[in-house]
Each structure stands twice: as structure tokens, then as C-alpha cells.
Amino acid sequence: MNIEKVIAREVLDSRGNPTVEAEVHLDSGFSGRAIVPSGASTGSHEALELRDGGERYMGKGVERAVQNVREALGPALIGMDASEQAAIDKALMDVDGTSNKGNMGGNAILAVSLATARAAAAELDIPLYRYLGGSNAKTLPVPMMNVINGGAHADNSVDFQEFMVMPVGAPSFREALRYGAETFHHLKKVLSGRGYNTNVGDEGGFAPDLKSNEEALEVLLEAIQQAGYEPGKDICIALDPAVTELYKDGQYHLESEGRVLSSDEMIDFWADWTSRYPIVSIEDGLAEDDWDGWERLTAKVGAKTQLVGDDLFVTNPERLQQGIDRKVGNAILVKVNQIGSLTESMDAIELAKRHHYGTIISHRSGESEDAFIADLAVATNAGQIKTGSASRSDRIAKYNQLLRIEDQLGDRAVFPGRKALR
């Protein structure tokens, strides 16, 4: 299954911003296509996302990245075996020649990397999840559904970026999705009843102008109960406060509440919330380079709460290993465009599993109809997925693909529920 041709084009993501789409064509006539996502809150240690600058698309065009695929990355792969994913990704990175993919762009490299995997699966006539994960790929992920948006994902007064529901008590993925969707619809009624708007943010969650961060928890608990579910049993809460965005001059600025907290005060803040609410997971609870604070946070609440590194680990095996060595966090968020290739993403997942860290496959705030991460979640038996709320077709595309996979697996499908949590 040798690569015959690589095509790239500029397309739009769910926010109307340009992104890269690549197609890999094989000499057998089969092909694969992939669109890369883009984040709003990005860690400083992520692979470089190459943008054009200038006036076109307000500087966010990706014609340079597309040109790099056409003129450098694609030609380097001609004649290579598409089933040799590690060799493909190494060839792409060799063309780039930097540690952060700064020459070709992580968005250019990733588009080709993912499209190659799809092309190989197409030629073998097997589902993508089976191609990537083999016969043992059978675990459907528990969804983390982002139903209240704040921070960089919304234009409102809520400091924290994501308030999510996790239907850990559901018996299957299909039922978990129903639990979450019903809660989402009841949340709309709760917010309307309190006089709040029900506009949605980048990831499909509501973005009300709440009085405080804690009110987000209150309305969420009310919605869970109105939907007929028991908080802490049927549905738990997961948070992504993304506090790197709030970290300035060594302190955490909660602007909506007029508070400035030290690392220790931020740790106490999370300890208090986890003691009073059914919060089972906190992502980026401290800033990406506050390693000492992360050690103390993990020691204080890590035994009972999943502590997820996103900006902290940026899907990078080297940063994850540093976290493992320092006993920092206990789970990793996996965003393929943070590291910029499929092979490196799967290396990070393997390293996490080897050291008993939880794994959560994640979308970005700028998404598309591409549902690659749904297959990746099942392929790696990750157990958890973050791909937005129960609205916006760019988010629903992933959920619908998981429903299809669950149907294909039939009785072999496993839904871990609460066991998915670290």
C-alpha cells in the first residue's frame, strides 16, 4: 500500500477559522482524508500551529502550511508504505527538523499523519479503530460533556473554562449519551428560569453570565436532578478550569470574584470544592509550569480526584515522564494536535497506561466534522473522551461515530463507567 499522492487544502473549522485538510492517495486507489483541529486556550509547550499572518482571515490563514504539505511533506512520502505509521511520522518530522514542528507546522504534519492512517485502514477494509488498536479495541469511553462554557471558550463572567457532566452510572455509551443530553436540555430550562441567556460557546455548552463560578455548579446540580438522575451516582461533575489562562505574576486571578490566590490558596480552593460537590475530575487545576504547586495539589486531593494534565503535559511523552517522576497529576489529556503526530500521541497514551495514569482523548475548541478522535478513543481503550456538549454538529459527529462503533462491536463492547476514572 504505497503512497502515490498527497493533497492538501485550506478548509474552515467550527469557528470559521482556516485549518488544514490533507488527503493521502495510495497506488491501490484507496485514500484517506483528515482535518486538523485548533485550540483557543493553548499551552506554551504545544507543537507550533503555522498561521500565515497578514490581513487575510485576520492573520489566521494556513496557506503556508498547505504549501508545506504540497511541496515538502507530501513528496517525502511518495513510495512509502502507508501501514508503517511510525516510519511515516518520522519522515514527516525529519523534513521539519525541529522539536516543536516549527518549520512545517504541527497542523501540516498532523493532517498528513492522520490521513495516512485512514488510507491504510481503507485499503485493509477495516474500521479505523480496529486498524489502530487491533482486535482488543473494544472499550467505549465515558463522555465528559461540556455543558457550561466560560473562560476563553465564552464571552461571559465565568472564570473557569469548562463545567462537564460525566454519566458514570450509565450501563452503556448509548445510555451515557442520553443521560448527558437530557441533562443538557434540562440545564437550558434551569438557566432560562433564572433569567439567563442560553447562547452556546465554542464547544456547544451554555455560556450564561452567572453571578459566580460556584453558581455554575449549583445550576448544574439542579439540572441533573431535574433530569431524574442522582448527582454523584448516575452523573458526576468534571472541571477544566484552565487556570494557566488566569495565572499572572505567580498568582491566580479570579476576576469574576475579585480574588487573587496563591498556589496554596488555589489548592485549598479545589480541596474545598471536591469536599462539597460530586467533582471527580479536575483538568489544569494549576498553571502549566507551577510544578511545585502540582505536587502539593496531587498530594492533597489526588487520592480521590482525577487530576488531569492538559497544558501541563501537552500530550508530550517527555513532559509526562517529568510528571510521573515528580508524582504530579494522575491522568493525561490527549490532544493529537498538541504534539502533532499520531505516533507521538499513541506513545504518550502508552506511557500513561504503563504508569497507571488515566487517559482522556480530547477535541479542541476549533473542530470540524472529522471524527478521528472517536476511533482513537476506542482504539486505545482510553476509557474517557472530551468532545463537547450535546449540541453543534462538529461535536455530535464524534458522539455519533461512537454510537456506530458500539453497534459494530455488539456484545464485545465494554463501557467502563466509574471504573474509567483514575
From Swiss-Prot:
Q: Which UniProt keywords apply?
A: Cytoplasm, Glycolysis, Lyase, Magnesium, Metal-binding, Secreted
The pathway that the record names for this protein is:
Carbohydrate degradation; glycolysis; pyruvate from D-glyceraldehyde 3-phosphate: step 4/5
Per UniProt, subcellular location reads as: Cytoplasm; Secreted; Cell surface
Residues at which (2R)-2-phosphoglycerate binds: 161, 335, 364-365, 386
Top-level taxon of the source organism: Bacteria
Documented EC number(s): 4.2.1.11
What reaction does this enzyme carry out catalytically?
A: (2R)-2-phosphoglycerate = phosphoenolpyruvate + H2O
Q: What's this protein's family per the entry? A: Belongs to the enolase family.
In Swiss-Prot or TrEMBL terms, this protein is called Enolase
Please spell out the taxonomic lineage of the organism that makes this protein. Answer: Bacteria, Thermotogati, Deinococcota, Deinococci, Deinococcales
